Design a protein with these regions (language model features):
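Left-handed beta-helix
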Residues: 1-81
């Protein structure tokens, strides 16, 4: 697992191979193996746990809302509820 300087990870489970880029915020979520979280992306929140599936990429500046279950990569700047 790699969490770059400036990234925030709080109350989250990060499986093997996960990379969280600088400026990303990961909160109350489960990231499966080999997930890449782009710079400035936001995953989860204070509510229900968000899930991101194996090998997916959450692009730079993208948002995955609390409680979301993600089975496909999320494009840069995209929002998933």
């Amino acid at each position: 697992v790699v969490v770059e300087e400036g990234a925030t990870v709080e109350d989250a489970v990060l499986m093997d191979g996960v990379v969280v880029k600088a400026g990303a915020v990961v909160k109350r979520c489960i990231l499966a193996e080999d997930v890449v979280v782009g710079a400035g992306a936001k995953i989860g929140g204070d509510g229900a746990i968000a899930h991101v599936g194996t090998g997916l990429t959450v692009g730079a500046g993208a948002t995955v809302k609390e409680g979301a279950k993600v089975f496909d990569s999320v494009k840069e700047g995209e929002e998933v509820c």
